[in-house]
Amino acid sequence: ICTGDGLSLAMQAGVPLMDTEMIQYHPTTLAGNGILLSEAARGDGAYLINSEGERFMEKYAPEYMELASRDVVSRAEQTEIDEGRGVDGCVFLDLRHLGKKFIEDRLGYLQEVALEFRGIDLSEKPIPIKPGMHYIMGGIKTDLNGATNVPGLYAAGECANVSVHGANRPVSYTHLRAHET
């Protein structure tokens, strides 16, 4: 969950921030609490449906459907919600067609989260999701060694701006951050 605490602390100390206008939204956060639901569900064949039961990604990314990039999927979900095809500010992640055994074997974590936080068995009912703020592409301005303009104050990891990802960080690129310096 992106809270921005590191950026706030740095800014209060007089450290400049860079490229904070570039924000990535994750397309599958759990309605109500924002828990991030793994994209493995979509990778394993889950559908995104609206309040009408329509697999809406065909309108937005017909070649990729649910496997489109995070920004495309997040915008599509928000469009469906804004145009009245959502329910309570959400669309749905539908795994019912995958079957109970597949869900338990391949997506057990998702099943546990759905049961614990929404009381939903994913093999029986779609789960409400919405785009949620996930990652800020920019961050605390540093040099190549992670030093800021405040002597002795360093920033590293996801709070630091290292200008690697541009406007849209692909899935699993967090690992790239370990190889940046």
Which role fits each region the language model picked out?
Residues I1:
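Glycine-rich beta-alpha-beta "Rossmann" dinucleotide-binding loop(s) and their flanking helix/strand
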Residues H26-T28, A160-Y173:
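Glycine-rich phosphate/pyrophosphate-binding beta-alpha loops
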Residues R106-S163:
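A glycine-rich dinucleotide-binding beta-alpha-beta segment and adjacent secondary-structure elements
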Residues T29-G34, Y135-I136, A167:
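Short secondary-structure transition/capping segments
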Residues L9, V15-D121, S172:
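An anion/pyrophosphate-binding glycine-rich loop and adjacent beta-alpha core
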Residues T174-T181:
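Conserved small/polar residues in nucleotide/adenosyl-binding loops
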Residues D5, D19, N50, D143, ...:
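Acidic active-site catalytic centers that drive phospho-/nucleotidyl reactions
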Residues G4-Q12, R177:
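Short amphipathic alpha-helical face segments that pack within enzyme cores
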